[in-house]
Each structure stands twice: as C-alpha cells, then as structure tokens.
C-alpha cells in the first residue's frame, strides 16, 4: 500500500497535504471504516464526533489525523484505504496512484465478513439517503408544480391587468380623440360665428352707408328744392322790376323837379332884397309850412316804407322758416320711415337668427342624446365584456385549482406508490449481498448525480426511481417478483388504471360540486339583487 517503510516518513508526506485533507474530508464518513480496521476505538470516535470543543470540521479532521498518527503505519494504511473508498480523487492526489480498492487492512483485521458488513451498512445508508432524496425530489416536484400553477395564475392575472391597461389606454385615446374632435368642432363653430358676425357687421355697415346715401340724397333734393324756390323768387323779382320807360319818366320828373328847385333857388336869391315885404313873408311862411308838411309826409312815407320793408322781411323770414320747418319735417318723416324699415329688417333678422338658434339647439340636443345613448350602450357592452372576462377568469381559476388539486393527489399517490415499492424492495432485499455488490456505493453515487442532472434538466422525478428499480431487478432477478407473484409491470399498470379511475371519479365529483355551488351562488346573487332592487 505504501512505499515508505518509516512511520514518520509516511506521516510527514501526509502533513504536506494536511490543509487539503482538513478542508475536504468529512470525519463522519471515514470513521466507520477506520473502526472496522481497528485503528480507531469507540472512545476516540466519540471524541472526534461528539466533543463539544470540536465544533469546526477542520479541527475534527486534525484531531482524527493526530489519533491515527499515534497508531503508526497501520493507521496510515487504513487512512489511505478510507480515502481510496470514499475520496478516490483525493487519494489519487495524495499518492499519485489510481484507486485499486483492495481493502487489505479491513480484511486482515475483520475478515471478509467485516468488509461485507461495512459495505452493507454503507449501502443501507445510501439507500436511506436515496429514499430521503427521492422524497425530497417528489416534494420539490410537487412544489414546482404548485409554483407552475401559481405562475400560470399570476400570468393570467398579468394578462388581465395588461388587457385592462390596454383597454384603459384605448379608452384614453378615444377620449383624447373625442376631445380633439370636440375642440375642432368648437374651433370651426367659433370661426363660423366670427365669419357670420363679420358678415353681419359688413351688412350693417353697408346698410348704414345706404342709409347715409339716402339721407344725403334727400338733403340734396331738399337743397335743390330750396335753390329752385330762390330761383323762382329771383325770377319773380326780376319780372316785377320797373321797366325802362318808367325809369325814363321818373328821370324826367326828377330833372323837372331839379329845374324847378333851381328856379326857386334863383327866385329866392332875387327876392332876398324884398324880404321885408309882407307878400314875400307870407310866401316864405307858406313855403316853410309846405316844406314842413312835405318833410312830415316824407318822414311818414319813409317810416311806412320802413315798416313795409320790415314786414316784408319778416314775411320772407317766416316763409323761409316755414319752408325750413317743412323740409325738416319731411326729413324727419323720411328718417323715421328709414329707421322703421331698418328696425323691421333687424327684427326679421333677429327672428331668422332665433329660428336658426332654435334649430341649432334642437340639433345639439339630439346629438347629445345620441352621444349619451352611444355612451350608455358602450358602457353596457364594456360592463358585459368585463363580466364575461371575470367569469372566464373565474372559470380559468377553477380549472387551475382543479389542476392543482389533481397534481397534489398525483403527488400523494406517487409517494404512496413509492413507499410501497421501497417497502417491497426492502423485504425482498433481506438476503445477504453477493461480493459483486462491492462497487454499489460508487454506482449509487453515479445514480444520484444522474438523478440530480435529470432534475436540473427538467426531467421527471420518476426516472431515478425507475432506474433504481431496474438496477435492483437486474442485480436480483430471482427476487424481482412481488409477494403476490405478479410482475412489476402488471402491478404498475394496475395501480395506474386504478389511479386514473379514482382521478376521473374525483374530478366528476368536484365538477358536480362546483356546478351546484355555482348555481347556489347565482341563486343567492339573484336573490340579493332582487332584494336590493326592491329596497331601492
């Protein structure tokens, strides 16, 4: 087993790998083999495994190495054989040789029966570990299935939430589009109202211009009439003007009067010398009296003519005022007629605008009513779609719950079946193993690794159980039968058929129970709705 004859030299070689050994080795695995090799007594084993001072695994391994080092070369060989059995890679690293699994130390110490007992103990431990792992795998498988069901439920809820979000976004987009359309319609209505107001203002301005032109025309007609009357007056005055013959006669009379005045002046100058005569005095007195009378008559005539001129002026002024008043009255009549026509036109326009306003209000109310009906129908349809979606989700949840219950039942049945198979295999494997089972631990380790690989790859947990059972059948072909004498395939088929029948019956019972519960819930819901409506 070792090329070193000196004990110190052997253990000095192992001291070079002490760090690696303490970090890799588990003392609880190699102590049974060392105890069978009689290099480790129960007290030492209890000290290594149960000492409260040795809590860390590395310290336990260090104490174990120190105890084995006290046994010398025998402990060194037993330790290497334990490494060869349980840690072949570490054995190859320490010794540089491939593990041969000769087990000379345990054979020399306890014989082949001790080796067989050790291997049987290890096999039982591994079988128990395999059972624990299979139970753990089945529970993990059930937990994974439950998680898948929960994941499907979560995805369903997420899809529903996403659908509700999409519906909400679609509704918001529709609302935004309706708002934009309403805003566009309002803008168009405002533009049309502005255009209509501008057209009305232009129409009013044109009407005012027409009225001003009419007024200007009437003023021009009045001015024309006044000028015509003045022209007629001037023509009448020109017609009443004295003629040339009358003017010539008046000029002759004037000349005669001037000549007479000159004669009188001459006679007056000649008679200045005879002023003292009474006749001349009488004449002068008469002349003065006549002159005074003439002056008075002239003054009277002048005053009468002045009064006449003033009366004529007043008459003319009154006539002009009368004509002016007549013209103003005519203008006022025409203005009143114009304003009356304008007011009538405005009233007609207001009546037309009121009719158009009533029509627009009626159209708007009708459109609002149609929009309200459309919104009510849309809300009713959305409510119906939401109720149908909720019903579909509830049905889907019921389906998922049924699947989860079925999976749980399958898991329980599988565990029961596994327990029955394990119990039957334990009963069948009560006889002693053959020597060819010496390589079983390594094969079981390979089987465990392959099972873990299958589980990590998404395989079914039934595969390692089937492989283990097939291996047991191949190793013990004469013990493969069950206590009833039936082959395992037929027994498995029978169990599967009974499980299928049980699952169908259970599913039918659950469906009937769910239908009854749903009918009772609907009856209770309709009853509560009726009571609510009656109470409202």
From Swiss-Prot:
One of its GO terms (cellular component) is protein-containing complex. There is a cross-link at residue 125 (Glycyl lysine isopeptide (Lys-Gly) (interchain with G-Cter in ubiquitin)). The modification Phosphoserine is found at residues 2, 277, 424-425, 431, 450, 460, 483, 498. Residues 503-513 have a biased composition (Basic residues). Keywords: Adaptive immunity, Coiled coil, Cytoplasm, Disease variant, Immunity, Innate immunity, Isopeptide bond, Metal-binding, Phosphoprotein, Ubl conjugation, Zinc. Changing residue 101 to Q: Disruption of the linker region, relieving autoinhibition and leading to activation of NF-kappa-B. One of its GO terms (biological process) is JNK cascade. Zn(2+) binds at residues 3, 10, 73. It comes from the Eukaryota. Maintained in an autoinhibited state via homodimerization in which the CARD domain forms an extensive interaction with the adjacent linker and coiled-coil regions. Activation downstream of C-type lectin receptors, by phosphorylation by PRKCD and/or ubiquitination by TRIM62, triggers disruption of the CARD domain-coiled coil interface, CARD9 homooligomerization and BCL10 recruitment, followed by activation of NF-kappa-B and MAP kinase p38 pathways. Zinc-binding inhibits activation by stabilizing the CARD ground-state conformation and restricting its capacity to form BCL10-nucleating filaments. InterPro entries: CARD (IPR001315), CARD_CARD9 (IPR042142), DEATH-like_dom_sf (IPR011029). Changing residue 35 to Q: In IMD103; abolished homooligomerization and formation of BCL10-nucleating filaments; reduced cytokine production in response to C.albicans infection; reduced production IgG antibodies in response to C.albicans infection. The modification Phosphothreonine is found at residues 231, 531, 533. Residues 427-536 are annotated as: Disordered. One of its GO terms (molecular function) is signaling adaptor activity. Changing residue 103 to L: Disruption of the linker region, relieving autoinhibition and leading to activation of NF-kappa-B. The keyword Ubl conjugation applies. Residues 6-98 form the CARD domain. Pfam families: CARD. It is found in: Cytoplasm. SUPFAM superfamilies: DEATH domain. It is linked to Immunodeficiency 103, susceptibility to fungal infections: An autosomal recessive primary immunodeficiency disorder with altered immune responses and impaired clearance of fungal infections, selective against Candida. It is characterized by persistent and/or recurrent infections of the skin, nails and mucous membranes caused by organisms of the genus Candida, mainly Candida albicans. Monomer. Homodimer; homodimerization is mediated by the CARD domain which forms an extensive interaction with the adjacent linker and coiled-coil regions; leads to an autoinhibited state. Homomultimer; polymerizes following activation, forming a nucleating helical template that seeds BCL10-filament formation via a CARD-CARD interaction. Interacts (via CARD domain) with BCL10 (via CARD domain); interaction takes place following CARD9 activation and polymerization, leading to the formation of a filamentous CBM complex assembly. Adapter protein that plays a key role in innate immune response against fungi by forming signaling complexes downstream of C-type lectin receptors. CARD9-mediated signals are essential for antifungal immunity against a subset of fungi from the phylum Ascomycota. Transduces signals in myeloid cells downstream of C-type lectin receptors CLEC7A (dectin-1), CLEC6A (dectin-2) and CLEC4E (Mincle), which detect pathogen-associated molecular pattern metabolites (PAMPs), such as fungal carbohydrates, and trigger CARD9 activation. The linker region, also named autoinhibitory interface, is required to prevent constitutive activation and maintain CARD9 in an autoinhibitory state. Disruption of this region triggers polymerization and activation, leading to formation of BCL10-nucleating filaments. This is Caspase recruitment domain-containing protein 9. It comes from Homo sapiens (Human).
């Amino acid at each position: 087993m070792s090329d070193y004859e000196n004990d110190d030299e052997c253990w000095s070689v192992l001291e070079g790998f002490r760090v690696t050994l303490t970090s890799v080795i588990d003392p609880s695995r190699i102590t049974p083999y060392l105890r069978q090799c009689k290099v480790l007594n129960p007290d030492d084993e209890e000290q290594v495994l149960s000492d409260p001072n040795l809590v860390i695994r590395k310290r336990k391994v260090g104490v174990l190495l120190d105890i084995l080092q006290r046994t010398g070369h025998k402990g060194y060989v037993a330790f290497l054989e334990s490494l060869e059995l349980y840690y072949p890679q570490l054995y190859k690293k320490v010794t540089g040789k491939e593990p041969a699994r000769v087990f000379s130390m345990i054979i020399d110490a306890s014989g082949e029966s001790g080796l067989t007992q050790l291997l049987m103990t290890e096999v039982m431990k591994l079988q128990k570990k395999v059972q624990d792992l299979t139970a753990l795998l089945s529970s993990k498988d059930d937990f994974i299935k439950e998680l898948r069901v929960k994941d499907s439920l979560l995805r369903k809820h997420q899809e529903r939430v996403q659908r509700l979000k999409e519906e909400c976004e679609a509704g918001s987009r529709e609302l935004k589009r309706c708002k934009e359309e309403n805003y566009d319609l309002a803008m168009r209505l405002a533009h049309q109202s502005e255009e209509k107001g501008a057209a009305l203002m232009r129409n009013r301005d044109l009407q005012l211009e027409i009225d001003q032109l009419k007024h200007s025309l009437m003023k021009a007609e009045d001015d024309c009439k006044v000028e015509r009357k003045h022209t007629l007056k001037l023509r009448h005055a020109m017609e009443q003007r004295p003629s040339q013959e009358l003017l010539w006669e008046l000029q002759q009379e004037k000349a005669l009067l001037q000549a007479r005045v000159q004669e009188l002046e001459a006679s007056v100058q000649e008679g200045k010398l005879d002023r003292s005569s009474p006749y001349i005095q009488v004449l002068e007195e008469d002349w003065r009296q006549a002159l005074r009378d003439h002056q008075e008559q002239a003054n009277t005539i002048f005053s009468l003519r002045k009064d006449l001129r003033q009366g004529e002026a007043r008459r003319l002024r009154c006539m002009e005022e009368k004509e002016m008043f007549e013209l103003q009255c005519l203008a006022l009549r025409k203005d009143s007629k114009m304003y009356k026509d304008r007011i009538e036109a405005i009233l007609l326009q207001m009546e037309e605008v009121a009719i158009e306003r009533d029509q627009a209000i009626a159209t708007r109310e009708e459109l609002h009513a149609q929009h309200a009906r459309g919104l009510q129908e849309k809300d009713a349809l959305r409510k119906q779609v939401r109720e149908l979606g909720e019903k579909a989700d509830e049905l889907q949840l019921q389906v998922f719950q049924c699947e989860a219950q079925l999976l749980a039942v399958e898991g329980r049945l599988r565990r029961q079946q596994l327990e029955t198979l394990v119990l039957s295999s334990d009963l069948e494997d009560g006889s002693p193993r053959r020597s060819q089972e010496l390589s079983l631990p390594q094969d079981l380790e390979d089987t465990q690794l392959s099972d873990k690989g299958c589980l990590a790859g998404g395989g079914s947990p039934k595969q390692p159980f089937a492989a283990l059972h097939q291996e047991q059948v191949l190793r013990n072909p004469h013990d493969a039968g069950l206590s009833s004498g039936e082959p395992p395939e037929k027994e498995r088929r029978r169990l599967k058929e009974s499980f299928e029948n049980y699952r169908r019956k259970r599913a039918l019972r659950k469906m009937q129970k769910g239908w009854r519960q749903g009918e009772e819930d609907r009856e209770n819901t309709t009853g509560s709705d009726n009571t609510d409506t009656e109470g409202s």
